[in-house]
């Protein structure tokens, strides 16, 4: 019997943001705990094999969700207060997910089974085929549309803890990379799919999609087609560097992939935190844009970007000044050649932040997918071209420079064409520049004037600089800090 559709009680943006931030903090802390162990046990070469398999399958997983995620979030957000209408829309999207996941899975298996170059690590590639199913059928878009960030956050925390426990339990030496691949696949997408689907069946999202209500799903194809092109362009623009390192590196390609990925893990973990926090505004951004509430859009963007700059500025400076120490502590001496990559890639954090907020999400909210696709294709072509030449000249450092160059160009084009510079770059941002200069000065003094061991050097620098960073922002009345202080005051008053 079909469960009756019902309206979901939603939490405030502050509460959702807190849940999202907590989950991503766990997602950032877990790598600090487990990756030093993983990289020392596996080594750069074995770690690079798993990284390459994950990067390759991600393109087929992309096929299974081509444009569906963004379209589903947008359409389900608009229909979320109409449970019956939401069930119909979600059912159509579910049917499309099922079709695309099947096509993607079969295509990937054909390549793995029949291309000779895949033979040496075929068992590993076959295990990663499950990634496609987990990604395509995870249905996370329904939780986002219903603003169930509490449930999503708990799921992500459980998955990360499970990942940590499994790695420490089963990884023994460099030959354990196949087991590591199984752990990555299960905790990465399969666990998410099982959690989400079981939760939806139990009514956590108010409705249960069903093929019974999926008639007319062909109506979704046209708008999703352009979002699919957009997703392809974005993937080629942001993630093609690892494959190109594997194909064009003049040194040991598996080792080069392992070195490069070890360096970008930290910046990408921070990107994940920032983008999860920013995703809290996505449903409301779509609604405000659809209703032409420009003032509300500006307010959402400004508040969110302030939070993101508050976090990202000291993080970028830490990666830049202490890249070698962080790589040494994080991955071991076998990975020290990746330190310059960490420095360069940390600068990309700002590009990701700006492009996601004032670029990609704004274009999708305004239904400018075609224009955004063209921009991302330009970025993808530039990124591939830069990588082709830079990797041959400078190896993994060249790959990082190529990605940074492409991000800078795409950011400039996106914000200029839609006139969205004012969403992000307000006078308030000078406060972070001011505080960042103080942090940079303290980092330089600690790094070059004191001969501390690596770990102590980082701890002292972050501790002292963190205090000065907060003090400076307090005196200039930075909005995020003032909001946190006000919340704390109110909490103490209630007690």
Where do the protein language model's features map onto the residues?
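Interfacial/gating helices of multi-pass transporter permease domains
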Residues: 35-61, 177-178, 216-227, 245-268, ...
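Hydrophobic alpha-helical transmembrane segments
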Residues: 129, 153-203, 223, 378-382, ...
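Membrane-proximal transmembrane or re-entrant/amphipathic helices at the cytosolic face
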Residues: 2-4, 444-495
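Transmembrane helical elements of multi-pass membrane transporters/channels
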Residues: 15-31, 159, 180-200, 214-287, ...
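Interhelical loop/hinge segments that connect adjacent transmembrane helices in multipass membrane
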Residues: 1-9, 177-181, 195-238, 284-299, ...
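Signature of the first transmembrane helix
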Residues: 9-69, 105, 164, 222-248, ...
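Helix-loop junctions and terminal segments of transmembrane helices
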Residues: 65-81, 263-305, 312, 359-365
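Membrane-interface junctions at transmembrane-helix termini in multi-pass inner-membrane proteins
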Residues: 122, 132-155, 347-378
């Amino acid at each position: 019997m079909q469960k009756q559709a019902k309206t979901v009680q939603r939490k405030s943006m502050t509460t959702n943001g807190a849940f999202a931030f907590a989950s991503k903090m766990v997602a950032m802390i877990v790598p600090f705990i487990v990756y030093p162990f993983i990289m020392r046990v596996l080594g750069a070469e074995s770690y690079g094999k798993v990284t390459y398999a994950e990067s390759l399958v991600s393109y087929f997983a992309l096929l299974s969700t081509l444009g569906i995620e963004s379209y589903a979030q947008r359409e389900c957000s608009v229909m979320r207060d109409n449970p019956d209408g939401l069930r119909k829309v979600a059912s159509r999207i579910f049917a499309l997910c099922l079709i695309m996941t099947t096509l993607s899975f079969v295509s990937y298996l054909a390549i793995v089974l029949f291309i000779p170059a895949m033979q040496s690590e075929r068992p590993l590639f076959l295990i990663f085929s499950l990634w496609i199913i987990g990604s395509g059928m995870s249905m996370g878009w329904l939780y986002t549309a219903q603003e169930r960030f509490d449930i999503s956050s708990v799921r992500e925390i459980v998955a990360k803890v499970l990942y940590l426990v499994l790695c420490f339990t089963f990884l023994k030496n460099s030959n354990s990379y196949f087991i590591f691949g199984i752990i990555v696949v299960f905790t990465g997408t399969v666990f998410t799919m099982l959690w989400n689907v079981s939760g939806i069946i139990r009514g956590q999202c108010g409705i249960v999609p069903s093929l019974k209500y999926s008639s007319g799903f062909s109506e979704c194809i046209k708008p999703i087609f352009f979002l699919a092109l957009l997703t392809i362009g974005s993937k080629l623009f942001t993630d093609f560097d690892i494959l190109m390192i594997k194909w064009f590196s003049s040194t040991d390609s598996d080792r080069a992939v392992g070195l490069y990925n070890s360096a970008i893990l930290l910046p990408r973990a921070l990107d994940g935190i920032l983008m999860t926090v920013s995703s809290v505004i996505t449903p409301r951004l779509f609604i405000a844009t659809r209703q032409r509430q420009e003032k509300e859009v500006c307010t959402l963007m400004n508040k969110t970007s302030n939070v993101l700059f508050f976090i990202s500025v000291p993080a970028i400076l830490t990666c830049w000044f202490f890249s070698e120490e962080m790589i040494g502590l994080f991955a071991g001496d076998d990975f020290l050649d990746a330190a310059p990559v960490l420095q360069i890639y940390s600068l990309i954090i700002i590009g990701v932040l700006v492009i996601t907020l004032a670029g990609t999400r704004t274009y999708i909210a305004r239904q400018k997918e075609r224009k955004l696709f063209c921009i991302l294709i330009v970025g993808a072509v530039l990124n591939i071209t830069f990588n082709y030449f830079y990797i041959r000249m400078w190896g993994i450092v060249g790959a990082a420079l190529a990605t940074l160059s492409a991000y800078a160009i795409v950011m400039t084009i996106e914000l200029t064409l839609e006139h969205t510079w004012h969403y992000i770059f307000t006078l308030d941002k000078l406060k972070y520049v001011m505080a960042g200069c103080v942090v940079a000065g303290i980092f330089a003094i600690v790094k070059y004037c004191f001969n501390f061991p690596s770990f102590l050097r980082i701890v002292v620098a972050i501790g002292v600089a963190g205090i000065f960073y907060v003090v400076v922002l307090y005196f200039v009345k930075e909005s995020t800090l003032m909001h946190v202080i006000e919340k704390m005051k109110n909490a103490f008053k209630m007690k």
